[in-house]
Amino acid sequence: MKEQGLGIREQGLGLLFCCVFFVALLSLAARAQGIQLGDAPAAAHKEHVELVSDAVQVMAGSPQMVELRFRVDDGFHINSHTPKDELLIPTELRMDAASKVKVLEEQYPKGSVFRLPLDPGNPLDVYQGEFRVSMRLVAPKGASTLVGELRYQACDNASCFPPRTLRVMVAVTGE
């Protein structure tokens, strides 16, 4: 009877060991695929895109074309404004309508063809490195701030990270 009790205890410990091993293995697999678990530091917390433009000067009260420059981190890409697949998240610049600077039109650059090593037959339309969004805007005389957000999803060759929103603030001087 004592032998049976040890057998059950050993079985319980064996089951516990298997569960711990399975959770550890699952955690390693999730990290390898770029999935964020808990508060572990990973590239998913990094923005991977930055605004390079910081100030522009325009003629006050008159429609002007300006370019906002953005830079995507090396080794990453983001979908263009018009991705080839409707399931992909497009890059979109949304400007604050309450701003003194009025945006009349936005023009996004054409994306470049990008092929994932694991799926070369399915080309993507992406931005890499530096890209520029042109805007036709009207600014009042004096100093103003163009305020908005860039919505995008950064990916590397293995996985895509959660969609991000980058705050955009550019000083505009109307002369």
Task: Describe the function of each predicted region.
Residues R31-E175:
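Extracellular/lumen-exposed scaffold segments
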